[in-house]
Design a protein with these regions (language model features):
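Charged (often Lys/Glu-rich) extended helix/loop segments that serve as interaction or gating elements
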Residues: 1-125
Length: 125
């Protein structure tokens, strides 16, 4: 079975690039038994955009949030804007269980900020 997620190799390239393992949990159901086998796949149109292959997880339903652990510095540092995908925000899970946003998500304005190839963009109303 496949589980498609909003994230993709743009956000975490290591599994797609060389099969790196990242533990995955289903938020709020961490203590449920892992009874289903899934390929967890990203949103790119590439056959290697996968976060996990044959991973045992609890049953996943539409709307569930998946936590991909130990992404750390690899997410942003190896990220890229393939297919026009914007980089996600980065969240830090602290030892006390609190979460802090340490980098905001990119916006379309960020994506086009370095373009300076002609006046066409400046003259759009």
């Amino acid at each position: 079975e496949y589980v498609g997620v909003d994230a993709c190799a743009v956000n975490l390239m290591r599994p797609a690039m060389y099969g790196a393992y990242h533990h995955i949990t289903v938020m709020g159901r961490e203590d449920e038994p892992c009874t289903r086998m899934y390929d967890v796949v990203g949103s790119l149109c590439e056959n290697n955009d996968k976060f996990a292959i044959d991973r045992m997880l609890p049953e996943i339903k539409k709307g569930d949030l998946l936590f991909i652990h130990d992404a750390g510095a690899h997410g942003f540092a190896m990220g890229y804007n393939y297919n026009g995908k914007l980089k996600s925000a980065e969240l830090l899970l602290k030892e006390d269980g609190t979460v802090e946003m340490i980098r905001r998500a990119e916006t379309p304005e960020d994506y086009f900020a370095t373009f300076d190839f002609c006046d066409i963009l400046r003259n759009i109303d």
